[in-house]
Amino acid sequence: MNLKEEILQKTNRGLEVFYFYMPIEFVPKRNFRNPLYDDKRASCNIYFDTQSQCYRMKDFGNEAYSGDCFWFTAAILGFDVRTEFIKVLTSIIHDLGLNIPIKERKTSE
């Protein structure tokens, strides 16, 4: 199993990652203001995407601020999810106290 999938398995398909890093309280499937920019309307929510089998954030006001828990973690921590993906994974494992060894493994973005 790859590291990304193992994180998803241990975090309720990414929902716990959103709960940990989200600087505001939210309820899945309920709209809130996006904390990543000065959002004027509550048009953002966290939902379970059946196609990818994980939780995702969707911002209907600004599509550029939508993505999965790995994208969101990168945005919060100031990482580039494409070039620093392993940093994102190791940050999640460390910050959430997941019992996942981080040796040389497949990350599978």
Residue ranges and their predicted role:
Residues 1-109:
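N-terminal structured subdomain of primase-like DNA metabolism proteins
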